[in-house]
Amino acid sequence: MQDDIKDITIIGGGPTGLFGAFYAGVRQATCRIIDSLPELGGQLTALYPEKDIFDVGGFSKILAKDLAQNLIEQGTQFGCDVVLDEEVSEVEREGDMFRLVGRSRSYLTKTILIAGGKGAFEPKHL
């Protein structure tokens, strides 16, 4: 199998990672998002999807799940590959590239953007 080399690989599919994917697309860079969670959006979708968010420019308030959906649409509009339920456990330098080692396979990239937020998490049910 031939490796699919990306210009940028983003570790983390929360708000920062999604905006990074958007900006990569604007700059016509190929990209990939790798996230350990089963869906994009980070804490917005995993912890408090029904919470109102008040500190986002352009909105007096917006539900976290709606903000996440907007960010997902914006971040993936240029065709960024998305890999979910995958954790990067190792980074290896290979010449002028990096190999990111995950549970299921490895990924070659020219640049890494780490946007892991607080890392993998699960909500605690009381």
Describe every region a protein language model picked out:
Residues 17, 40, 62, 91, ...:
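Flexible, glycine-rich phosphate/dinucleotide-binding loops
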Residues 12-16:
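Glycine-rich Rossmann-fold phosphate-binding loop(s) that bind the pyrophosphate
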Residues 45-106:
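N-terminal Rossmann-like dinucleotide/flavin-binding domain of flavoprotein oxidoreductases
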